[in-house]
Amino acid sequence: MGVIDLITRVDSICKKYEKYDINRQRDANVSGDDAFSRLYSAVEYALETVLQKTEDLSSETNKAKAVAMNAEIRRTKARLLEGIPKLQRLSLKKVKGLSKEELDARNDLVLSLRDKIEAIPESSAPVVGGWEASTSYSNIRFDTNVSDDRIGSEYFQPTGESDQFKQEYEMKRIKQARLDYIAEGLDTLKNMAQDINEELDRQEPLMDEIDTKIDKAATDLKSTNVRLKDTVTKLRSSRNFCIDIILLCILLGIAAFIYNSVK
């Protein structure tokens, strides 16, 4: 196979699968209002961050820190899975500048992203310094005749370092729980804001139509008032003319009466 044939084959393969490139879809978006691309990028970035944390967790030697990291990974994984249904709804929304094939490919992108999120490992880091089985010390024997006075309640009394470690761990746990609560609240507010924005976008054509109808009604009412004013003016003029005729007839009658009396 020659170089030209190889380049042609690579170009055909790239063209076949370019509809699955979310970055190209974002660049090709003309309207600039693609909520799917924004949410997909955010979830993808969070997924990369979680995967990096899982790699750090595998090499973590501090047991308390490893437990905290593992809990954070589980919470983030659950949060990412909660965003998948919204991504699926947004993938069905038509976007100006994208073809039908690219819109159909978005569902495949969401399914692939969900599989990656579900594949995130949740195992904690290995415990360092714990009890491990070893065949090199199979000859070690434990003496069961140790006096109870040597292993009493004082042997298990907490030290200053252990109390300090416990306090620090409890403070970090409480602080992390509060931060998680705040983060969940912010996520909820963010989702509400996005939903409100989408609803406003859907209601905007209706508001424009209502404004148009109001303007038309105001124009019709103004023209009706003008016609009504003209009609009232005409009626008033006709009434004044009739009154003038009646008064003239009365005056003529009085003049005729006086003339007949004098004659």
From Swiss-Prot:
Q: Highest taxon of the source?
A: Eukaryota
Indicate yes or no for the key word Iron: no
Q: Where in the cell is it found?
A: Membrane
**Stretches in topological domain Vesicular:** 262-263
Q: Provide the GO MF annotations for this entry.
A: SNAP receptor activity
Any GO BP annotation? intracellular protein transport
Q: Which residues lie on this side of the membrane: Cytoplasmic?
A: 1-240
Q: Which residues form a coiled coil?
A: none
Q: What does this protein do?
A: Vesicle trafficking protein that functions in the secretory pathway.
- Name used for this protein in its record: Syntaxin-73
Organism of origin is Arabidopsis thaliana
